[in-house]
């Protein structure tokens, strides 16, 4: 019974030395790659007042946010469940830079619920966000950074999944759906409930062209030829629809020639509908039952609650969740030298010199505890020299 106090909550795990070393290696690899692409590192706090943490586009995180009362102010605080709203707050309220901003971030987040399909309740989130540009060029830049970052940490066999939530949004608008009908349709598409969708479309009072567009929607799922089908079946509905599909076509054209990158499309995918405003994208590891490695999308308008709505696109990945797919970094075995636990200025100088040479220094308390063959620092003729037991 007593041992139960050592158990961690469901979905919250320790990282032991080998895993922690591996995670830190790849964290550094990713951040270095972001920096070389012009993205500046920011580190938001682990907790904030819920007034800012769960406002605007962050409202959808309320059910996943662990909350508590701040003993200093009496106000409600929350532990972040996603870092993107925090980064948007920093970009809007703290940096206040005009033009394009590129920011990256890393940190642990905490969720109230354990979703086994998505892994840990305490992911280590790392990502990059681009603020201040609305064109297809910034979407392409962010997707390219996502793909190249995964390649740089050794994940080569990738599937890039693309969608655009504005396609469904515009179809609902041109068809004159009521707010209730829109809400019902979004719910049906999120659940992938095909029979319900068929019944819903059959009951719509819309033009024949609009009904055909709704009937076509679920079939717009597959390879890059999907965009051509969508252009033929949907582009004529409105000018905004044509723009959304042309935007998608530009992204597909850019990535179609990437070696080892498969492209999958699903124009009925509404993941993050309450949050995203345009392109949505994700990367999957093909050899792991289509495990989602990274995801992102456009979320224009974020930051309006802080006084300045931002054009924004970005992506993030759970580094802890990806550990099993990453190989342990190959590194030269470091030399270990043992040093006695005494204070001596000359000894400290010798230790500092060895550490500069990347030698690991471990203190020993009893000489007899050292194994035979161990290297250690010994005081001989008033000098600290390396000896072997």
UniProtKB/Swiss-Prot annotation:
Pathway: Amino-acid biosynthesis; L-histidine biosynthesis; L-histidine from 5-phospho-alpha-D-ribose 1-diphosphate: step 1/9. GO terms for biological process: histidyl-tRNA aminoacylation; L-histidine biosynthetic process. One of its GO terms (molecular function) is histidine-tRNA ligase activity. This is ATP phosphoribosyltransferase regulatory subunit. The lineage of its organism: Bacteria, Pseudomonadati, Pseudomonadota, Gammaproteobacteria, Thiotrichales. It comes from the Bacteria. One of its GO terms (cellular component) is cytoplasm. Transmembrane segments: none annotated. PANTHER family: HISTIDINE--TRNA LIGASE, MITOCHONDRIAL-RELATED, HISTIDYL-TRNA SYNTHETASE. It comes from Hydrogenovibrio crunogenus (strain DSM 25203 / XCL-2). The gene is hisZ. Keywords: Amino-acid biosynthesis, Cytoplasm, Histidine biosynthesis. Its main location: cytoplasm. The keyword Transmembrane helix does not apply. It is found in: Cytoplasm. InterPro entries: aa-tRNA-synth_II/BPL/LPL (IPR045864), HisRS-like_core (IPR041715), HisRS/HisZ (IPR004516), HisZ (IPR004517).
């Amino acid at each position: 019974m007593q041992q139960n106090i050592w158990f961690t909550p469901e979905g919250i795990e320790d990282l032991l030395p080998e895993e922690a070393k591996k995670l830190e290696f790849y964290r550094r690899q990713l951040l270095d790659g972001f920096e070389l692409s012009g993205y500046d590192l920011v580190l938001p706090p682990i907790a904030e007042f819920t007034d800012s943490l769960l406002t605007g586009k962050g409202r959808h995180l309320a059910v996943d946010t662990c909350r508590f009362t701040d003993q200093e102010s009496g106000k409600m605080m929350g532990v972040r469940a996603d870092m993107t709203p925090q980064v948007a707050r920093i970009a809007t309220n703290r940096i206040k830079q005009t033009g394009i901003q590129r920011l990256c971030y890393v940190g642990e987040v905490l969720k109230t619920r354990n979703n086994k399909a998505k892994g840990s309740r305490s992911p280590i989130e790392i990502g990059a966000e681009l603020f201040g540009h609305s064109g297809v060029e910034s979407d392409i830049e962010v997707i390219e950074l996502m793909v190249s970052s995964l390649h740089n940490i050794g994940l080569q066999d990738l599937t890039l999944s693309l969608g655009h939530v504005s396609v469904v949004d515009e179809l609902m608008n041109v068809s004159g759906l009521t707010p209730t009908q829109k809400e019902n349709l979004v719910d049906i598409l999120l659940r992938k409930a095909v029979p319900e969708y068929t019944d819903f479309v059959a009951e719509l009072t819309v033009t024949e062209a609009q009904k055909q567009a709704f009937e076509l929607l679920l079939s717009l799922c597959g390879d890059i030829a999907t965009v051509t089908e969508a252009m033929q079946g949907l582009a004529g509905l409105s000018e905004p629809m044509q723009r959304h599909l042309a935007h998608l076509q530009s992204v597909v054209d850019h990535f179609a020639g990437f070696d080892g990158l498969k492209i999958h499309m699903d124009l009925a995918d509404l993941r993050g509908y309450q949050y995203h405003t345009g392109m949505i994208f994700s990367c999957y590891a093909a050899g792991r039952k289509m495990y989602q490695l990274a995801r992102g999308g456009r979320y224009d308008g974020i930051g309006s609650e802080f006084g300045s709505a931002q054009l924004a696109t970005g992506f993030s990945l759970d580094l802890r969740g990806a550990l099993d797919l990453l190989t342990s970094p190959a590194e030269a075995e470091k030399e270990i030298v043992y040093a006695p636990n005494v204070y001596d200025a000359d000894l400290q100088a010798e230790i500092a010199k060895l550490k500069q040479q990347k030698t690991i220094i471990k203190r020993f308390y009893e000489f007899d505890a050292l194994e035979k063959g161990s290297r250690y620092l010994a005081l001989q003729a008033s000098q600290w020299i390396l000896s072997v037991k």
